[in-house]
Amino acid sequence: MNLICSILPKKEPSYLKLWRKQVIYQVLTDRFALDEDNFYAKASGNLYLGGTWKGITRNLDYIKSLGCTAIWISPIVKNISETTDCGQAYHGYWAQDMTQLNENFGTEEDLKELVNAIHEKNMLCMVDIVVNHMGHAGSKPVNFLLYQPFNSGKYYHNWQFVQNYDDPHETITGWLGDSHVNLPDIRTEKNEVRKFFQNWVSDLIKRYQFDGIRLDTAKHVEKSFFPTFIEAANVFTTGEVFHGDPKVVGDYQKYLPSTLNFPLFFQLRETFLDPKHSMFSFYDKAVLDVRHYFKDVTVLCNFLENHDFPRFFHETKDIALALNALTALIFMDGIPIIYYGQEQMFDGGSDPDNREGLWKSKYNTSNPMFRHLSSMIRTRQNLVETYPEFTYVLSFQLYIDDSVYVFTRPGVIIAISNEGSTSSFKVEIDLKEHWKEVPSSFTDILTQKTIPCKDHKLKIKSKSGLPKILISSDPSFL
C-alpha cells in the first residue's frame, strides 16, 4: 500500500463497515422543513417554528442532491411543554416522557413513513437519544411524578449543578442547565434504569428501523452504562463527549463504537479561523494525537458546525477558508457530518441564532457553496465505491509547512491552506518517493482543470487560497 497507514478490518460489528461509507446530514427537526412550503414563515427564535417529520420526508431529495447518504434527526420523545426563559423544547433535549413521541413533530405513522422513505432512497437514519437527563422549567422544586418512566426522586441524583466539567464524579452526578431550565440527572448507574434503557432502545430500533444513534451528553454518563446499552441497540452509536482533549475523548472509545470528534472540531475552528495557527500544530493535534488516543479513528464522526456553536460564517465571511475547512472535514480520516444550513452559508451566532429555519433558503441547490460542497461529497462517495480500502486506509502526509498541508488517501490528493482568499500557494511533490506507479495527470474537482504530472513531480498551485482536490486519472496509482 506504499507507505499509507491503514487500520485493517478486524472482527467487528457489520454496522461499522456500513457507517464508514456515509456522509451524515444533521437535521434539527423543528428547523428543517414545514408540512407545507412557506418560504416566508418565521425562521428564527427559541420557540417551536413548525418543522416536522413530514416536512423532512417531503424534502429528502434536497439532502440526496447534496450527496449525503445518512440523516441524523433530533430526539423524538415527548418534551416539557412550558415556555421557559430559554424558550421551548423545540430541539428535543428536555424530555418528559420517554414512552411517548413529541407530537409537535408528528405522529408515529409520520415517523415510520420518514424512516421508510429514507431507506427507499438508499439512505440511513440516525436518531438522537438522551439517557442522561430529563427537562425541568424554572427554579421551583421538581415534581418527579410528571416524568415517565422515572417518576420518583429515587431515580435522580441529588440536585447540584455541575461546576467543574473536568471533575469526573461531578460531571457524572451533577445536573446540567441553570435556574431557567435545569436537567434532572438520571441515576444511570442503577440496574433498573439500565434495564429500562436496554429494553427501550431495543424496542425503539425495531419499531422504527433506525440505523444508528447519536448519544447526547455521553460525557455525563458512567462509561460502564454503554456496553450493555450498545449491545441492546445493536446499531452504530456515536457519543457526544464534549471535550477538546483527545486523551479524554479517546478513552470513551473503549466503551462506545464511536464518538463525535470534538478534538478535530476545535482544531478545525482554530486553524481555519486564525492564519497564525500553524499547520504543524494542526497536524500534531488533529491527526497524530487523535490517532494515538483513539482506538479507531475511521469511525469517528467529524464536524465543523453543530447546534451548540456559532456558525463558521458567523466568525468569517471568507469563502476560501470555509472551503478549506470543509475539504479537511470531508476527506480526513473518519465520517463527515454536515450541519443543515452549512450548504446555504448560514451565519447565525450562538443558540438559537445558529438554529435557523432552512425554509428561508428556499432549498436553493444552485448557489456556489451548495455546488462546491456537493462536488466534494460526491467525490468522496465515488472514492468509497472505487477504492474498497478508502474507508479504513488512513490519510498520509505528503507535504506540510506553516500554512499548507497536503495529504493523500486512496485515489485523491488534498491540499489545504489557512491563509484565506487573499493568499496563494505553490507546492511541488515528487510522487516517486511514495508510489511505484505514478499517474500522468490529475483532475482538480473544484475547477475541472487537468494538472499534468511530469517526471513523477506534481506541481500544485492555488490562487485565492482555494483548496485542491486532485483525482488521479489512473485508478491504479495506489
From Swiss-Prot:
Can the keyword Amino-acid biosynthesis be found in this entry's annotation? no
Q: Tell me the GO molecular function terms.
A: alpha-amylase activity; calcium ion binding
Q: Which UniProt keywords apply?
A: Calcium, Carbohydrate metabolism, Glycosidase, Hydrolase, Metal-binding
Recorded superkingdom:
Eukaryota
Record site: Transition state stabilizer: D308
User: Which InterPro entries does the UniProt record give?
Assistant: A-amylase-like, Glyco_hydro_13_cat_dom, Glyco_hydro_b, Glycoside_hydrolase_SF
Annotated residues for binding of Ca(2+) 2: D216, E240
Its name, as the record gives it, is Uncharacterized glycosyl hydrolase C11E10.09c
Which species is this record about? Schizosaccharomyces pombe (strain 972 / ATCC 24843)
